[in-house]
Amino acid sequence: MPMSLGNAFIKNFLGKAPDWYKVAIISFLIINPIVFFFVDPFVAGWLLVVEFIFTLAMALKCYPLQPGGLLAIEAIAIGMTSPEQVKHELVANIEVLLLLVFMVAGIYFMKQLLLFIFTKILLGIRSKAILSLAFCFAAAFLSAFLDALTVIAVVISVAVGFYSIYHKVASGKGVSSDHDHTQDDHLAELTREDLENYRAFLRSLLMHAGVGTALGGVTTMVGEPQNLIIADQASWLFGEFLIRMAPVTLPVFVCGLLTCFAVEKLKVFGYGAELPDNVRHILVEFDKEERKARTNQDVAKLWIQGLIAVWLIVGLALHLAAVGLIGLSVIILATAFTGVIEEHSLGKAFEEALPFTALLAVFFSIVAVIIDQELFKPVIDAVLAVEDKGTQLAMFYVANGLLSMVSDNVFVGTVYINEVKTALVEGIITRDQFDLLAVAINTGTNLPSVATPNGQAAFLFLLTSALAPLIRLSYGKMVIMALPYTIVLALVGLFGIVFLLEPMTAWFYDAGWIAHHVGEATHAVSGGH
């Protein structure tokens, strides 16, 4: 019996998503205007934030762009925010958007070099705990100089490479033949068990790398986008930022690596999966075949990619241009010197990041609602009202951490540093207290936010990437796997803020490593940014 037109509309709405999910989204769309107009705009704002987090949590059922986008469009239509404010948010975050558009595509053209290096690491280190430490440390080191999103893009492209090599051979095809690694139909039962273990193995490595980006990203002013904003407000340069953060970031870094080692050894929270022998064998064979088949042309490509990688790190560490523009230069150099000149070959590189870029634009429209409806104001006011300076530092760290778990840490960091800047300009706090609070804000936004994928853009990118469903990495799984790290990073960070920050900073002043700032540096950024 043919489907009626009404049923066809319902069937088409959000496609293959389960019916309960469709009903949930439709009911959100009906409830929001009612709450906004007849109950309280503030309540409606928080309701929208919770609903948006729900769409992120269900990313494996339906990509969050569609449901989240519908919620955002309705929010703008009923006046929770304005198109101007959304545009203002996008303009303020243009560097992050450029980064996603160009840098992630640039990394795509560095794939051969990355696979070459990481295959050596993966096959060279037999111990899973040491391998995890290597991934975590490498991600942390890179994130101190590059953006966390760039580092995660590198790790994702490597993991997809590894996954597809094994999947191809397990499906009975040669290493070099074309293959769709998203379909499991051709696998025998024996290889399925290996595949599950291999997925668990890749999941744990990706989570270690993800947390690594947070460990490294908090230490320097180029590590995360909000660090730049905070450094700019406080007029700190690279060296001073590093030193001022050290009392908190160094203990956290050491404890983070210890946690990485511990969860692998104890095999808890979904960690501890070893690389199955069959898979190792296939990867070793792949490496041998690659070495045999490598022509001078391939070697030349690896050299070119190596030189471009050097330019990438130098360009980013010295901030020679906006991150996205350096990414664009990587695309141009890599394609020009490796001979990729057809338009359709270029298009593939952009497939991974553009859906996420669109999702981030929707995310910023939710942020615009948070700003216009002043959703965080009660929390911020309560913390600024605390008289005792030491308590105020701890409260700032905790409040920042909690808000960063539900909202984007770039946004939370920006809102807080603006409020504190305003307090400084109005003479409510001293310049020295402002400098200490800036450390509390930076560490508060960067460390506890590993708890959920909405806190860290790098985690969100990983969750919504094409790789996540392949290795069965869901929102809930990420939260559970991040839990030991969340607890350790948040508590050690708090310990650093309460007990180490003030005495260490005083010692740095006495030693002449940093100097007291006078006056209020630059004026607070306008609006939400």
UniProtKB/Swiss-Prot annotation:
The lineage of its organism: Bacteria, Pseudomonadati, Pseudomonadota, Gammaproteobacteria, Vibrionales. It comes from Vibrio vulnificus (strain CMCP6). Belongs to the NhaB Na(+)/H(+) (TC 2.A.34) antiporter family. It holds the Pfam family NhaB. This is Na(+)/H(+) antiporter NhaB. Keywords: Antiport, Cell inner membrane, Cell membrane, Ion transport, Membrane, Sodium, Sodium transport, Transmembrane, Transmembrane helix, Transport. InterPro entries: Na+/H+_antiporter_NhaB. Na(+)/H(+) antiporter that extrudes sodium in exchange for external protons. PANTHER family: NA(+)_H(+) ANTIPORTER NHAB, TRANSPORTER ARSB-RELATED.
